[in-house]
Amino acid sequence: MLKMNLANLQLFAHKKGGGSTSNGRDSESKRLGAKAADGQTVTGGSILYRQRGTHIYPGANVGRGGDDTLFAKVEGVVRFERKGRDKKQVSVYPIAK
């Protein structure tokens, strides 16, 4: 009688398993920066500049919100100006009628 040895058949992966990473995501952008240009006409309440902290300071007829957003208090023309040697400010000057 002929005895056959049955081979022990084992299957292995032909590609390595995909590892995990702690990267691969990013936060949504906050859309900060200028929302009105120098010389542009704006209405009262218009947002002029969105920022974190005070990169630009409020000037004439400009208010500062709780999140440091600068907004126009009156209708007029936007002007970005220097405030001293190293600071900047934005002002809104009413249009003469």
From Swiss-Prot:
What keywords were assigned to this record? Answer: Ribonucleoprotein, Ribosomal protein
Q: Per the record, which residues fall in region Disordered?
A: 14-38
GO terms for cellular component: cytosolic large ribosomal subunit
User: Which PROSITE patterns does the protein's record reference?
Assistant: RIBOSOMAL_L27
- List the propeptide residues: 1-12
GO biological process: any one?
A: translation
In terms of domain of life, where is this protein from? Answer: Bacteria
Q: State a single Pfam family of this protein.
A: Ribosomal_L27
Post-translation changes: The N-terminus is cleaved by ribosomal processing cysteine protease Prp.
Checking Gene3D superfamilies in the record gives: 2.40.50.100
Give the family from UniProt. Answer: Belongs to the bacterial ribosomal protein bL27 family.
What name does UniProt use for this protein?
A: Large ribosomal subunit protein bL27
Task: Please name the gene that encodes this protein.
Answer: rpmA
